[in-house]
Amino acid sequence: MKNLISITFLCFQLMFFGQESTSSSELINGINFQNELIKNSLVKNLEFSNIGPSVMSGRVSDIEVNPNDPTEFYVAYASGGLWHTINNGTTFNTIFDNANTQNIGDFDVDWNNRTIIVGTGENNSSRSSYSGIGILKSNDNGKNWENIGLSDSHHIGKVKINPNNPDEIIVGVLGHLYSTNEQRGIFKTNNGGKTWEKKLEIDEKTGIIDIDIDPENFNIQYASSWEKERASWNFNGNGSKSGIYKSTDSGENWELISTKESGFPSNSGVGRIGLSVYDKNTVYAVVDNQSRRLKEKEVKKNAIDKAVFEKMSIKDFMKLNDKLLNDFLENNGFPKKYDSNEVKELVSSGEIKPLDLKLFLEDANTVMFDTPIIGAEVYRSDDGGQTWVKKNSYYLDRLYNTYGYYFGRIHVSPTNKNQIYVYGVPIIKSNDGGITYKSVDYQNVHADHHDLWINPKNPDHLINGNDGGINMSYDGGKNWTKLNQPNVGQFYSINVDNEKPYNVYGGLQDNGVWMAPNNSVESARWHQTGHNNWTSIGGGDGMQVQIDKRNSDIIYTGSQFGVYFRLNKKTGKRNYLKPKHDLGESPLRFNWQSPILLSPHNQDIFYMGSNKLHISLNQGDDWSFKSIDLTKGIKSGNVPYGTLSAIDESIFKFGKLVVGSDDGLINLSKDGGNTWALISKDLPQNLWVSRVVFSKHKKNRIYATLNGYRFDDFKPYVFISDNDGKNWKKISDNLPLSSVNVIKEDPFNENVIYLGTDNGA
């Protein structure tokens, strides 16, 4: 299997800066150039050992099962390729290594002729969703792949093959994630992909996310459009162009059926829509309704909710019960220096306003989980989509939270039109046509679900794909088995310690932080011994890891948006390390993958980046210093932006620091952060600084990698300076087309450097 390193960050917007996205011709030429380089590579015969982990797997995008033999099926992973099993998931074989991408949105199989059609480019539109190269076709179970078009699509929503005519294929194209483009909508081929015709076009911001078809009549098709705009600082995943279309002539012509008169939502709050067709009459849809709820959630009696501070007067604030205010401060993690007396004094003196208590708590995680939107709604039509009725009798809380763009799927049982499954963070099941629900994912089922197959001959037989891999049930979801043999986890970062054998640590997308000895061998034997070489040491989206060189039991790691801990592996004790701003100050902004660093000169000194550089002299127990804002500043939006993305310290001089930001700045300090010099004026502007590192061979040498992925710009940007950033030289002109995420200098030979990109190393 190809060794791919995916280091994931937030997203940039094309229109704001005018950055050019990569054209389809550049993309194809880049692939050809990369293939030529591989043929002539000095290390092409170098063997890599797979050390795991497979105890957890990676994000599934699609599952297709042989209708005549359910022990044979294919699984597509968002950035892990396509895998095949013929023994009910006991083992899998990768069949996508000969493709020129590992990123998949959806696929379909013509089981009669064993033809596989893959739509490349994940369709979930998340921070870690990578683009594809169009539609790929294989007639020999993945030994060879042919690109059959739509190379400027970037992300594919759905692929459907006519089971009675495999040359007829319908594709829902979602389009570019971070820029507008024309290759969106519904495309159809009648000759197996030799030529394509666009059958439905909405606009350059709206693509097709789902297609489902009457199981008895391929002529009757339903498709859902999705209007969205993504930028580094904002994601608008909804719009009035999101809707449901129907075709009665096999996709040749389409009609919008989610009109205001139909009963289906048609306002600007409509987000991603998932579809499931039972027969010619009954159709289900789940919609991510981003409209605000009319009524806020109820607050517990005898408790203060942060929302009350939004419009509270100083006079009313001073009347607050001291015990209730102290409980509020303690329960919400305010620094100990703030008690009711201190806070009331600050408000009375005018140093802060009551609103500041609410703002103090509003970081990126609260926005993601606590914003009071309607969320997932289930609709049903019993007249072929002419009219729709909302079925859920209560809010489906915590199914989507605020990020329904990441899910958006629904399935109806092939044998019971009143039994449906809806999935987001959990899977929920309804046996009464969507009125009431119960959860059916249990202890050994990972959260965040993306696909579900229901056996038409045995509807209690389910195969589920989620962020942690594959699960199977034979009792309608009461019990599940894990099928996690593929090693397809998506790493944000890796690090190693100095033990013998040394341990490898890694933070993974939605799979936490794991560690294992470097000589680990992937084997099913752990099912017998009960011991897996890989150990979980953190949850959430696993982020960066730093290891104390004096004592490898001391680990610094954490999850998204700056939630970091110092962990003692021996005792299990965890110390929370995230810096806080003071009441009345502008809130700190933390990157999704906030950078951390232990000083090479003193392992008690811990650096962490928000929009400022924070320095602790005692392992993060408190923060003795914070810098000025080292970014271009805050930008209005619902995603933290203007944050630090990279930190390094020179091994030649204590306190010589360099930091990079997500909005394209690189700053250098030679006095421990007291003063800073901007050194990126002559570099390409506004690109994400994925890495900025000092050389370990030359004291004034700095390397910088910039990443245009968030502009849909996939060119490599690698620069070197030999005078502390006064002048830069580009050294990436002879590299293949791929965004660069990480750079490492060889510890023994200054002329050898290593790069990790979106398409390999």
Task: Enumerate the predicted regions with their spans.
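Bacterial Sec-dependent N-terminal signal peptides
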Residues: M1-S24
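Beta-propeller blade termini and top-face loops
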Residues: E20-A761
